[in-house]
């Protein structure tokens, strides 16, 4: 019978002084320390349980192995696929996010830096290599395949994530080695879709045209670019480029479109629907270009309550082309599942912004795969072929030349470089570029200048500064056509409410709900963290209180009319996905007796402009969403976006987080700072998610 973690702990926890512990030489002492870390919120209960499991497997396990396992599991929760043993030893506390955000407790708690102070990287690796719990790369014996940990030089993995990484790498190598046959008249087809190349010396390279050309060569390609660079326009033309010859041959391609969230899928559905209609192609081709976008989970056929899908290597997806939008949100496990379920002959095209935040779950797949996108690294053969079929002069692009053997993946990646949404005169566009380049002083100067109508910076003087409430409630005070706050959608809710005697099945209720949902998209407050006075939890309470005091909402209780909620998990029974936003409204009861009940209105996200009304009692996995994390905002856009930073520097504060927050704004962006300087400190830090995915790619 397996022992629980509690069984492994000495009973007199409170009687043992932390100073007397020897956690790197005695397993019992290590377990006591880990329990204390869990009590303080430094480790997850899951990390603790994993160590208990390993101790059960090997009662003689070296504490060095167990502490490495605990930290690897902990890092997984922070998005890292593996633990780099040497990097961890350089700056243990910050590298491990220990103590975590918001921990203000004092005391004599043993920190990772103290625990690991005398440890040498080589000795740590040696201890792991000698453990019965750890398999080394290259050992494919039956015994090794049963070991829960994998050591790859200086990187330690949980076996499952090592397997995901290798499955992705193997699938990509297979697709990159597999040449497709582009149409013989590819140059003419490209010119028909994009126009002939401009030979003027100052002409801008048509990167959209190049990305479509490259996608015809192999079974895998990536189109990356920032907001407004035309990723959707490009993919619509790519689908026309691929589908036209197939339709003409009488064998149209089966094309599927997917996105990670319901909101991202709805945005792409709407955008593609509009653009397909304006394509200069025959009606036969137009009819075979799909506009309906599904979520990745629905595409694969998610099995509720499990991590398995209906489609997998033994039951492949019935398609010839798969396009995945917002690919930066796809984590390592999901990418492995997608590639497993893809037929060998099918093409896969990833769309996304490589500079956005990585997925919430482990991995930074798009960022890893686009590592060379900025500089190109096209081989002479790739460049010559692109120039021949497109007429473009890549010599003007300032790219670095590469070797197809050393950079096989780079040959199938194109970065779109010209934003049509944020032109040279856009303050948002300029700020996003400066943030991406980590030009912190220039970014501060731009914000301080006040010379752009679409940028605003608010420095707060303490937690009770009323300027925060004014911005969140009323925006920037420039009237109905300017940047709004939350008063706007609540005014729409009140002003446009249908007559009370309207029947529930009257279309006026759906029109009203759509109007309120649209008005809510006029403003969104984004946070970097969840905890503390400047985190999601505290700010949602504060804004709710401010709206109640302003008599804009009727209650501060859990459910009230006007409450905006965010789905935090998928609910397939209700057809709602993680990230979907709904607004609580008061509607007539179905029995028509004149009573009204609260229902939550969610957009149907299928391009139909429909609304799904759900009783609050059926929504178990929702939270109030006046404030949401930047992570949760990915795939969404808001007319006016405000980003509030915490006072203290935190590992999540990076230039990627700031960039993602800025680029959620369509028309106006506001930066809110409780402390001057935190913006610059964040810009100097980059996300570095540890993985070995690019080895060999």
Q: In which residue ranges do the predicted regions lie?
A:
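Conserved helicase motor core of P-loop NTPases
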Residues: 355, 359-565, 571-573
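Residue-level signature of catalytic and energy-coupling elements of molecular machines
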Residues: 88, 168, 261, 295, ...
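N-terminal pre-Walker A segment at the start of P-loop NTPase domains
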Residues: 183-206
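N-terminal accessory nucleic-acid engagement/regulatory domains that precede
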Residues: 3-16, 21-185, 328
């Amino acid at each position: 019978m397996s022992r629980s973690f509690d069984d492994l702990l000495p009973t007199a926890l409170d009687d043992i002084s932390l100073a007397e512990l020897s956690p790197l030489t005695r397993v019992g002492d290590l377990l006591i320390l880990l329990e204390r870390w869990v009590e303080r919120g430094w480790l997850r209960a899951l990390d603790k349980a994993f160590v208990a499991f390993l101790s059960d497997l090997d009662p003689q396990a070296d504490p060095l192995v167990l502490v490495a396992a605990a930290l690897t599991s902990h890092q997984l929760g922070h998005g890292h696929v593996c633990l780099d043993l040497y990097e961890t030893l350089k700056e243990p506390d910050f590298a491990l996010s220990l103590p975590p955000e918001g921990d203000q407790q004092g005391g004599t708690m043993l920190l990772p830096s103290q625990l690991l102070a005398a440890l040498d990287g080589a000795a740590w690796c040696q201890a792991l290599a000698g453990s019965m719990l750890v398999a080394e790369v290259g050992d494919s014996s039956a015994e090794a395949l049963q070991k829960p940990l994998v050591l790859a030089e200086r990187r330690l993995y949980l076996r499952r994530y090592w397997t995901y990484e290798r499955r992705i790498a193997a699938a990509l190598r297979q697709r990159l080695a597999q040449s497709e046959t582009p149409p013989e008249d590819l140059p003419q087809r490209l010119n028909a879709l994009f126009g002939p190349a401009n030979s003027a010396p100052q002409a801008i390279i048509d990167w959209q045209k190049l990305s479509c050309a490259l996608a015809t060569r192999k079974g895998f390609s990536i189109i990356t670019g920032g907001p407004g660079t035309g990723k959707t326009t490009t993919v619509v033309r790519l689908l026309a480029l691929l589908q036209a010859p197939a339709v003409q041959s009488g064998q149209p391609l089966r094309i599927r479109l997917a996105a990670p969230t319901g909101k991202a899928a709805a945005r792409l559905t709407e955008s593609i629907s509009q653009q397909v209609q304006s394509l200069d192609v025959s009606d036969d081709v137009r009819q075979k270009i799909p506009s309906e976008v599904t979520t990745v989970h629905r595409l694969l056929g998610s099995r509720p309550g499990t991590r398995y899908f209906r489609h997998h290597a033994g039951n492949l997806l019935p398609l010839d082309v798969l396009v995945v939008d917002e690919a930066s949100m796809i984590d390592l496990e999901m990418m492995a599942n997608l590639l497993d379920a893809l037929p060998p002959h099918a093409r896969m095209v990833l769309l996304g912004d490589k500079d956005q935040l990585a997925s919430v779950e482990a991995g930074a797949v798009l960022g890893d795969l686009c590592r060379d996108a900025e500089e190109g690294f096209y081989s002479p053969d790739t460049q010559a072929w692109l120039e021949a079929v497109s007429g473009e002069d890549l010599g003007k692009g300032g790219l670095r030349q590469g070797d197809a053997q050393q950079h096989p993946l780079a040959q199938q990646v194109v970065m779109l470089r010209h934003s049509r949404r944020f032109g040279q005169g856009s303050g948002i566009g300029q700020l996003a570029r400066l943030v991406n380049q980590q030009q912190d002083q220039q970014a501060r100067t731009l914000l301080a200048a006040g010379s752009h109508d679409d940028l605003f910076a608010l420095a707060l003087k303490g937690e009770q500064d009323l300027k925060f409430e004014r911005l969140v409630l009323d925006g920037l005070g420039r009237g109905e056509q300017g940047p709004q706050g939350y008063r706007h959608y609540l005014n729409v809710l009140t002003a446009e409410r249908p007559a009370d005697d309207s029947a529930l099945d009257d279309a006026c209720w759906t029109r009203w709900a759509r109007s309120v949902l649209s008005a809510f998209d006029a403003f969104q407050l984004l946070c970097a963290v969840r905890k503390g006075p400047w985190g999601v939890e505290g700010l949602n309470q504060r804004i709710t209180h401010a709206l109640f005091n302003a008599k804009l909402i009727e209650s501060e209780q859990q459910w009230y009319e006007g409450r905006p909620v965010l789905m935090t998990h998928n609910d397939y029974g209700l057809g709602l996905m993680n990230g979907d936003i709904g607004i609580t409204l008061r509607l007539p009861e179905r029995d028509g007796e004149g009573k009204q009940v609260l229902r939550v209105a969610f957009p149907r996200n299928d391009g139909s402009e429909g609304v799904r009304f759900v009783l609050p009692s059926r929504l178990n996995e929702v939270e109030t969403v006046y404030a949401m994390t930047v992570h949760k905002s990915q795939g969404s856009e808001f007319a006016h976006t405000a980003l509030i930073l915490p006072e203290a520097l935190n590992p999540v504060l990076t230039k990627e987080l700031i960039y993602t927050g800025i680029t959620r704004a369509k028309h106006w962006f506001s930066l809110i700072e409780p402390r001057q300087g935190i913006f610059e400190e964040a810009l100097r830090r980059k996300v570095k998610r540890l993985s070995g995915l690019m080895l060999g790619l």
